[in-house]
Each structure stands twice: as C-alpha cells, then as structure tokens.
Amino acid sequence: MNNLYQRDCLRLLDFTSLELQNIITLAQKLKQYKKNNKEIQLLKKKNIALIFEKESTRTRCSFEVAAFDQGAHVTYLGPGSTHLGTKESIEDTAKILGRLYDGIQYRGHHHSTIEILAKNSKVPVWNGLTEKFHPTQLLADLLTIKEIFPERKFYEIKCAYVGDAHNNMGNSLLEAASLVGLDLRLVAPKECWPEKNIFKFCKEQMKNKKGNIICTENINEGVKNVDFIYTDVWVSMGESQEVWKKRIELLSSYQVNSLMLKITNNPQVKVLHCLPALHDQKTCTVKSILKKYGFKNGMEITDEVFQKNQKIIFEQAENRLHTIKAILVSSLLKTIKF
C-alpha cells in the first residue's frame, strides 16, 4: 500500500522526512525511465484540473507534461476563466471539481484558498505556488542537489540562500531543511528574513538532526564554505513601484556575483536559481527594469555567474517535471508498480 495515496501537497511539512525522500527517489526513477524512452503510463484514465490564478511557464508545463507522460488528461483553468471565489464560493467550486477530477493543482495568491480546496474537494490537491509556500520547487531543488552529490547525506551539504527570504521560497526552504537535515543559511537583511514562527518551528525540528538553519545579514559568514548559493528574483511583476524601490535598496549588496563566489572559499561552489532570472537585457521588460534601478549586469545575479551555472540551473528547472510527476503518481495510485 502506498501511504501517499490520496494525500495533498500543500506544503512540505505535509510529509515526513522519509516520505519526502521517497518522493525524491521515485522522481529519480521516473526521470531515468523518461530519459531511456521507457516511460510506463501509470495514470491512464485519470483527469487533473490545473487552476492558475497566476500565470506560469515552468509550473504549468511541468504539470501538463508530467500528466501527459503518464497517460492522464488535464484541463487548464487560467486567470479569469473560473468563478472561483467570485460568482461561486471556493467551497462549491472544490466540491464540483472533486466530482469531475481525480486531482487538482492550484497556483494563486492566497494559501487559504488552497486549504479550502483541499478540505472540500475530497481529491488530492497540489500547491503550484501560493504566497506562503512553493513545495514543488523545493522538491526539484532537492533532486538537483542529490544528483550533484549522490553519495553525500543532506546534512553534509551546505546551502546559502541569498536575497529575499521573507516569502514562499524562504518558508519552503526552511521546511525542506528541517525535514532532510540540510545545512541552510538564509543570507539577507533582517527585513527580508522569513516569518519568525516558521523559522522557530523549523529550527526546533532540527534539534535531532545533524544539519542546521541560520539567518544572517553577514554575507561573509553566510556563504563561507558552502556547496551551493541559491537565489531568486527580489521582486515580482505586479508589486508596486514603492515595494520594488525599497526591496532593491535593501538587497543591492546581496547580488550573486563573482566576488561572492570567491568569498565562499570553494572553487567548486554551484549556483541555483528557480527562474525567471533578471540576469541579462534580452527582453524590453528586464532591460527597462535594470536601467531604471542602475544595474548594468543583472540584478539578483550577474550574467557571468548565470551563464557559468546555466547547466545546473536549467537541470533544476527540468527537475520540476520529474518531481511533479512523482507527486502525481504517489497521490493518485494505491499501489505503484513498474
């Protein structure tokens, strides 16, 4: 019996440490099957609803391809194409979708919405991103880290997340570290540290593990001897100009650049980025943003560092597919047989 059958994935703490690592192991196996053209379709006749209140590239494509690879069908419900929470309550929408579909993915603005969907739909619900958590991204990150260091335990791996950690990425990184024992440093000004209650809870969970979690403003302390530096965009499209200005002023000295890599004292340090990245000026939007705020060579990461690490970064992005596929298979099948 698969103990993840019919389980939701709203946040990583929905799983135990063993369950999380089993998902990573399954993702490795599914990735190998796909690479070897030996995909076994385990989800035939399954129907999946993809609710996107926020637009997406990687999350949507990963869910769709994962479902198609496994023989499932999907319905994409994009921004403005449902009555969710407007003409119809979230509860009522959840109840009807739960009768029509075997599982529901939600990507949107409010974590409370996905909690209501999960409570009322009676089918597995998966979080593609909310303002609180981004669990599917962290599953891909853990798979990427494991692929680079297959022989090392997570507690033997040091990762510094540099930039804005007061968001879904900071929260999910904390949860991931607390479950697998990753040695995690969140390197940011205090205004950009994660919520205190989440940090305190995850720190408490680490007591019986060999890893560690710290928050620090000190870049030298935070990145010294790390195996990975991880960053993300400092601001999102749609946030006000006031938010952009304040955030960029706070984080301008936390750019991931060649100097920061030297500070790690590790010539083999790897860089992760969950994308999209403001690293070059090849689009009008990014070009205007960089010019407005006085950046000549990328914002949160320089183009030089991005290009040198692009193989890992795009592998990390591809791993969204394989880990999401593992989540779908785990939650929609009573027994997993290859």
From Swiss-Prot:
L-ornithine binds at N168, D232, S236, M237. The keyword Disulfide bond does not apply. Carbamoyl phosphate binds at S56, T57, R58, T59, R107, H134, P135, T136, Q137, C274, L275, R320. PROSITE patterns: CARBAMOYLTRANSFERASE. Reversibly catalyzes the transfer of the carbamoyl group from carbamoyl phosphate (CP) to the N(epsilon) atom of ornithine (ORN) to produce L-citrulline. Belongs to the aspartate/ornithine carbamoyltransferase superfamily. OTCase family. This is Ornithine carbamoyltransferase. It comes from Buchnera aphidicola subsp. Acyrthosiphon pisum (strain APS).
